[in-house]
Design a protein with these regions (language model features):
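The feature marks the mature, well-folded catalytic cores of soluble enzymes
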Residues: 2-416
Length: 416
């Protein structure tokens, strides 16, 4: 976390864009919970591969150090430990995970409760389970927690607690609900939707699919993780309780390479977005539905960029992987589209996607090595566009990039 000013850390949430100057962001450094993922269960835990905990933590630490040059950065585990000292928050957390908490004293130290909630609690099992060396969990660990984008979204000064598609991530919803309800740093105008408590059949919403593009414009991917029913629920809440008047729904393929909208599209400047070309031009382009608060019905557009033009956001694409299809596929798989903007025209990206970085340079960005940026060997000019790179060879094996690993809760305004 950056040093506090004399007035203390910023409190309260507000997100009105994907690119506004970052002020406060939440992260989770991957830890021992990664050790539960094995070749036989990796798909159940939603992983593409097995991660080395130490390497993943080091690479995540480099990303966090870069973020700290721009904003206050908070570890989710630190905030969770603090809310466990709030009686109402502790009661909520324990009531929502009774299988394991019923076996422990409610007076357990906050840091021990944090360990249980994040690293899980292994079941003692019975005679047969012990004999066969088969481990089970009364509370499953959360190896996906470092992809903190998914369990919650801030829209304006309101919060959406996700309704995660897969049960292995449901505890993440409970944690984020407790934090946004009880931590003063995250004070807000109310919960728009509470996926931890309001779960309904076929209703799912995940943060990787929700992009606050402007104060009045939200784009959502209808994907394998975010359902039509979830989007309908979100639409009603947005149009009745926020300043959002335009909702753009991208009809996504049900495919592992594009589980969320942010795997194929991220905004990096006022008029630029990094995008996966096959889904935005040619025969496989993804239709986008435009819903407006002021009218009934739905308008269908050829793709998201066309729909954005209708709401006065004329974005140009920077194509992930450049112009060659094979390289586009390889770099999209390696989270080449999954950038995270810290201010207009400055974004974080993995260093491995060289053709994507070249495409960004052609669009006016300078590729800046993250280590050189941190040591001061390379500086970024005030009006200069830059993409700051860091090594993500281990992190990417989990299936996400910088946007996936960050939950911004406060950004400054954008001068459009």
């Amino acid at each position: 976390m950056v040093p506090e000013s004399s007035s203390g850390p910023r409190e309260g949430v507000r997100i009105t864009s994907e690119i506004g100057p970052l002020e406060t962001v939440l992260c989770h450094t991957p830890g021992p919970e990664l050790g539960v993922v094995t070749p036989s269960n990796r798909e159940s835990y939603l992983f593409n591969d097995l991660l080395d905990q130490d390497k993943a933590a080091r690479q995540h630490g480099r990303m966090r150090a870069i973020l700290e040059r721009f904003a206050e950065v908070y570890e989710i585990s630190d905030l969770l430990e603090e809310v466990f000292d709030v009686p109402e928050a502790r009661r909520y957390l324990l009531e929502h995970r009774p299988d394991v908490t019923g076996e422990k004293s409610p007076d357990l130290a906050p840091e021990e409760w944090v360990r249980v909630f994040i690293e899980g609690e292994e079941s003692s099992g019975g005679t047969l389970a012990s004999l066969l060396n088969e481990a089970g969990y009364t509370l499953p660990p959360l190896p996906n927690l470092f992809f903190l984008r998914d369990p919650a979204v801030v829209i304006g000064d309101r919060v959406v607690v996700a309704a995660m598609q897969h049960e292995v991530r449901w505890t993440e919803e409970v944690i984020l609900r407790a934090l946004f309800s009880h931590h003063p740093l995250l004070s807000n105008g109310g919960i728009l939707y509470d996926g931890a408590d309001e779960r309904r059949m076929n209703t799912s919403i995940e943060g990787g699919d929700v992009h606050v593009l402007r104060e009045d414009v939200v784009a959502v991917g209808m994907s394998e993780r975010t359902s039509a029913a979830g989007i309908d629920t979100l639409r009603r809440a947005l149009f009745s309780r926020t300043d959002v008047t335009e909702l753009l729904v991208v009809l996504m393929p049900r495919h592992r390479t594009s589980i969320h909208l942010d795997m194929i599209f991220t905004m990096v400047d006022r008029e630029l977005a990094c995008a996966y070309a096959p889904y935005f031009r040619g025969p496989k382009r993804l239709p986008t539905l435009h819903l407006r608060a002021s009218e009934e019905g739905v308008r269908e557009k050829a793709d998201l960029f066309e729909a954005l033009g209708d709401v006065g956001m004329d974005l140009s694409p920077i194509y992930c992987g450049g112009g060659g299809r094979t390289v586009q596929e390889r770099e999209q798989w390696a989270s080449g589209c999954n950038l995270f903007a810290v201010e207009p025209g400055t974004a974080l990206a993995y260093d491995r996607n060289e053709h994507t970085l070249s495409a960004m340079e052609e669009a006016g960005f300078r590729a800046v090595d993250g280590v050189e940026f941190l040591t001061g060997d390379t500086e970024i000019g005030g009006d200069e566009r830059a993409v700051i790179t860091f090594e993500g060879s281990e992190l990417v094996r989990g299936g996400g990039g910088p946007r996936c690993m960050t939950l911004p809760v406060r950004r400054g305004p954008v001068a459009w």
